[in-house]
């Protein structure tokens, strides 16, 4: 079961951390595409909340974020020594954050074939490509938004 604010187990602690990393990447991509990260459709608009970035995050949760987190645990790259525990929360310690950040960096450098463009791109550029396509839709240059669907 998903728990957050605070995460109550190791998997939720890493999911929250990776979702935050991906959200920041999406925010930067949206700003590069001259889109306001706060002006979303799916997530409630609140001051300081990057609603549009959170909207786009939904496309990336399973294929990028969740897959990376499960891989870290399945390959035993994270152990109980990578976490701090108290009665209310489980948090990554410095060693755990370093492990996740290294895996995140490595993952972003891998290449995939973008399902819509049919071109090889680095995983780290997917948010930028999607933000640019969303901007093209909003400008009327593209008829509909092609979501990132990776098999």
Task: Please describe what each predicted stretch is.
Residues 1-151:
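Active-site helix-to-loop segments that bind/position phosphate- or nucleotide-bearing substrates
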């Amino acid at each position: 079961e998903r728990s957050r604010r605070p995460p109550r187990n190791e998997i939720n602690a890493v999911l929250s951390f990776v979702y935050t990393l991906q959200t920041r990447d999406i925010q930067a991509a949206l700003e590069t595409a001259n889109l306001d990260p706060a002006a979303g459709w799916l997530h409630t608009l609140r001051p300081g909340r990057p609603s549009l970035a959170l909207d786009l995050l939904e496309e990336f949760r399973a294929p990028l974020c969740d897959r990376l987190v499960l891989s870290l645990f399945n390959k035993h790259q994270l152990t109980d020594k990578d976490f701090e525990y108290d009665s209310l929360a489980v948090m990554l310690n410095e060693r755990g954050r370093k492990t996740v950040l290294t895996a995140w960096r490595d993952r972003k450098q891998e290449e995939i074939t973008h399902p819509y463009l049919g071109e090889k791109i680095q995983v780290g550029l997917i948010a930028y490509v999607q933000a640019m396509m969303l901007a093209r839709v909003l400008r009327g240059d593209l008829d509909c938004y092609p979501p990132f669907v990776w098999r």
